[in-house]
């Protein structure tokens, strides 16, 4: 072979340069490979990577649904485990039959079977973690462990009127005694005027043990918890503000902060009560929330069933600081307190000074964004858990509440200091709290607290006809 001269080297360099350009003649992409070759490559991927590969384009989606690939993944993940490597011959035969009949199933059959069983294993693991209950609240005591085991998180999906969607990952999360507080903030909010709804969804990884994998790229399924209408951000839903922020409440439990100057989104805070939170965050679909199974009344011949034996646990908190944490037992009502479709439970009475309680510290709703933070005075998050006589949660909520001026204690003696009240209501009941501001100690004292339960809920729960 003759040595290459300068002219030959120059021609070769030009050819290399041309071939490095993105042209149809020289480019070689995975999508140009035969399907048989692509299937061979996909067969080396694990389940998570295979699901991601199916999102590349329509061809990859169909190839990544191959039954022969998925039945091997299924068999490896859920093969029967026996000591000393012994496997039941019948189970081994079933596996062989499944491998032979994989081609007879519709495309994606074994992928669905694998994902169904994988999700069921996540739910089973969570059920074991969530089984121990707190004696006072009746709520799971290992919520933090359940979140760690499952990788459960929450996202909001903002929907524009033109059909566009914006999925936002949470920026902060804290677990309280009776609730979880999830916060979203950032600089990439779409213009509020273009948005119509906000979907709050639970987001659960299909595969456990992927906590180190960025949430955006790991396979997850969404469960719709609540759909909010952003058109309801009006003066009637405002709960307060400061020099930078106006804050609104959209029931149930959603706090929306708007920049005062721009009237654009600054943060969103979801307050989620722990009662059946995991079920609501995992068992729904992206479009339909999970519905709790209907309650079956306990057989009880007592003429006053449903009127006694209630237990209440109530918290008021914000930003990791609690100003109230109290439990109350043996709450009851008489038939004389059944009026206007409500049953009244007196928790704290004016007439018993020993029941009056202070709110510890400053009452305020803390907020933060990437650049600023602040506190909305006279607002707080209230978590309420009411258990009935059999220890089952009867009424639960986690929501912002406001301490507002009121005329004074409605049926009690005159107190020194200004009078305030806190009110909350939803479809199952309402709460009324009355407080007095003590100037000497600079703190609020709760001098009255009453719950009003809807008789329709009481009758449905206990099978009564009050």
Swiss-Prot record:
Residues 27-73 form the F-box domain. SUPFAM superfamilies: F-box domain. Substrate-recognition component of the SCF (SKP1-CUL1-F-box protein)-type E3 ubiquitin ligase complex. Directly interacts with SKP1 and CUL1. The gene is FBXO15. This is F-box only protein 15. GO terms for cellular component: SCF ubiquitin ligase complex. InterPro entries: F-box-like_dom_sf, F-box_dom. Keywords: Ubl conjugation pathway. PANTHER family: F-BOX ONLY PROTEIN 15 (PTHR46731:SF1).
């Amino acid at each position: 072979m003759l040595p290459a001269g300068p002219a030959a080297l120059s021609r070769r360099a030009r050819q290399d340069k041309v071939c490095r350009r993105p042209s149809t003649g020289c480019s070689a992409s995975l999508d140009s490979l035969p399907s048989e070759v692509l299937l061979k490559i996909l067969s080396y991927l694990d389940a998570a990577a295979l699901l991601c590969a199916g999102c590349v384009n329509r061809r990859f989606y169909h190839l990544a649904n191959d039954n022969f690939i998925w039945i091997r993944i299924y068999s490896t993940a859920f093969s029967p485990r026996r000591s000393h490597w012994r496997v039941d011959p019948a189970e081994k035969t079933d596996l062989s039959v499944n491998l032979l009949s994989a081609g007879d199933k519709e495309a994606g059959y074994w992928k669905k079977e694998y994902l169904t069983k994988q999700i069921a294993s996540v739910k089973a693991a969570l059920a074991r973690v969530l089984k121990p209950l707190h004696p006072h609240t009746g709520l799971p005591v290992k919520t933090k462990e359940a979140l760690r085991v499952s990788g459960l998180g929450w996202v909001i999906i903002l929907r524009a009127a033109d059909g566009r969607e914006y999925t936002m990952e949470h920026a902060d999360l804290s677990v309280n005694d009776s609730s979880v507080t999830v916060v979203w903030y950032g600089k990439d909010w779409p213009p509020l005027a273009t948005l119509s709804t906000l979907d709050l969804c639970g987001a659960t990884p299909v595969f456990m043990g992927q906590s180190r994998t960025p949430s955006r790229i790991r396979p997850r399924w969404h469960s719709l918890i609540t759909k909010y209408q952003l058109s309801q951000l009006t003066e009637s839903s405002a709960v307060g503000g400061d020099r930078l922020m106006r804050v609104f409440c959209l029931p149930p439990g959603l706090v929306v902060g708007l920049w005062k100057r721009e009237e654009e989104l600054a943060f969103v805070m979801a307050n989620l009560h722990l009662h059946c939170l995991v079920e609501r965050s995992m068992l729904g679909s992206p479009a339909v929330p999970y519905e709790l199974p209907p309650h079956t009344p306990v057989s009880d011949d007592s003429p006053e069933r449903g009127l006694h034996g209630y237990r209440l646990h109530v918290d008021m908190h914000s930003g990791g600081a609690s100003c109230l944490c109290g439990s109350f037992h043996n709450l009851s009502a008489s038939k004389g307190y059944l009026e206007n479709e409500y049953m009244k439970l007196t928790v704290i009475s004016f007439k018993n000074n020993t029941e009056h309680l202070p709110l510890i510290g400053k009452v305020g709703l803390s907020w933060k964004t990437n650049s600023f933070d602040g506190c909305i005075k006279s607002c707080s998050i209230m978590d309420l858990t009411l258990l009935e006589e059999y220890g089952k949660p009867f009424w639960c909520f986690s929501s912002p509440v406001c301490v507002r001026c009121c005329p004074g204690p409605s049926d009690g003696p005159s107190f020194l200091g200004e009078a305030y009240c806190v009110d909350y209501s939803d479809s199952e009941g309402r709460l009324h709290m009355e407080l007095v501001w003590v100037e000497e100690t600079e703190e609020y004292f709760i001098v009255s607290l009453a719950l009003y339960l809807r008789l329709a809920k009481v009758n449905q729960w206990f099978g009564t006809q009050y």
